[in-house]
UniProtKB/Swiss-Prot annotation:
Gene: pyrD
Phylogenetic placement of the source organism: Bacteria, Pseudomonadati, Pseudomonadota, Alphaproteobacteria, Hyphomicrobiales
Protein's organism: Xanthobacter autotrophicus (strain ATCC BAA-1158 / Py2)
Residues forming the catalytic site: S175
Gene Ontology biological process: 'de novo' pyrimidine nucleobase biosynthetic process; 'de novo' UMP biosynthetic process
Protein name: Dihydroorotate dehydrogenase (quinone)
Membrane topology note: Peripheral membrane protein
């Protein structure tokens, strides 16, 4: 039995948040075996933003909130890891309980509210990693403090502190658990924010060829008009990419769990159809001019392939790990490679957006 097989029964006797804390402790212990399956199939390699990804399957933000275990997570076979969301100043987030497993639905509801240790320890760990020459692409996902009255200042602080240490940056303006945050997705507000953080990044990194790519993370709940605003704001400001999407406030009628009506954002299997449809719509709007990371409901190679065909240059998973364990990463990669080859694609890039062009 593997380590996950040993721990899984223990997780069921813990609250979801306790199980998460135990997972972090195990990853920090150095006891995690290499589950990567060896070198990735060359068909999975892809180059985006000048970064060479060994495979397109990444870990979404929210697991390694404080940038504690990025290197251990690469032992699962991820092509990249996104740490955060980190806020400028420490904050506890929302009261417990704030994380719920919907086992019958293979879904999760969370209302964490950007619990964060703040930028100082996050940046220290990123800096340690950079100084040690560790390999592996690590992104930094930044947000705003709940009580902050100046979103521009908070996001600017996050970008300024992390841009020279992370491989890519993400401004998270789509969490449903910070009051008023999603209002930043409106066109005027989004253009103002993105113009500001891009200027902060550029001032910190004067050489255009060496600038860390900056992405924006948006919600799957955006209607067509709002999605068009996101596309136009992104193209107008020159942001480098978009993540579609975050958790959803919607509740599909199919949900069975007793936790289905808990307040917070829903992730996992029930989000797959919505997030993939919105991904395709966004890809059409940006016309392939901006790379998109597809997130939401991925639990198989088929799901990942659907995201790629809908317009994702890269994909991320998180909730599915709760139900299927870390071995899922290698299974997704193996199946994705087989599907690409079966359809005659020589690379991930060749398949991006083929269903929506």
């Amino acid at each position: 039995m593997d380590l996950y097989g040993v721990l899984k029964p223990l997780f069921r006797f813990m609250t979801p948040e306790q199980a998460h804390h135990l997972s972090i402790r195990v990853l920090k212990s150095g006891l995690v075996p290499d589950l990567s399956g060896g070198p990735d199939d060359p068909v999975l390699a892809t180059r985006v933003w000048g970064l060479d990804f060994p495979n397109p399957v990444g870990l979404a933000a929210g697991f390694d909130k404080h940038c504690e275990v990025a290197d251990a997570l690469f032992r699962f076979g991820f092509g990249f890891v996104e740490a955060g969301t980190v806020t400028p100043r420490p904050q506890p987030g929302n009261p417990l309980p704030r994380l719920f497993r919907l086992d019958e639905d293979e879904a999760v509801i969370n209302r964490f509210g950007f619990n964060s240790e703040g930028l100082a320890p996050f940046v220290f760990r990123l800096g340690q990693r950079r100084a040690s020459g560790k390999h592996g692409i690590v992104g930094a996902n930044v947000g705003k403090n709940k009580e902050s009255e100046d979103a521009l200042e908070d996001y600017g602080a996050g970008v300024s502190a992390t841009c020279r240490l992370a491989d890519y940056l993400v401004c998270n303006i789509s969490s449903p658990n910070t009051p008023g945050l999603r209002a930043l997705q409106a066109r005027a507000e989004m253009e103002t924010l993105l113009a500001h953080v891009i200027s902060v990044r550029n001032a910190s990194m004067p050489d255009p060829a060496a600038r860390t790519p900056l992405l924006v993370k948006v919600a799957p709940d955006l209607d067509d008009a709002a999605l068009a605003d996101v596309a136009e704001a992104s193209l107008a400001t020159g942001v480098d990419g978009i993540i579609m999407g975050n958790t959803t406030l919607s509740r599909p009628a199919s949900l069975q769990s007793k936790f289905k009506d808990e307040t917070g954002g829903l992730s996992g299997k029930p989000l797959l159809a919505l997030s993939t449809e919105r991904l395709g719509a966004l890809y059409r709007l940006v016309g392939g001019r901006l790379p998109i990371i597809g997130v939401g409901g991925i639990a198989s190679g088929a799901d990942a392939y659907a995201k790629v065909r809908a317009g994702a240059s890269l994909v991320q998973i998180y909730s599915a790990l709760v139900f299927h364990g870390p071995g899922l990463v290698t299974r997704i990669k193996t199946d994705l490679a087989a599907r690409l080859k079966a359809d005659g694609f020589a690379s991930i890039a060749d398949a991006v957006g083929v269903d929506v062009r």
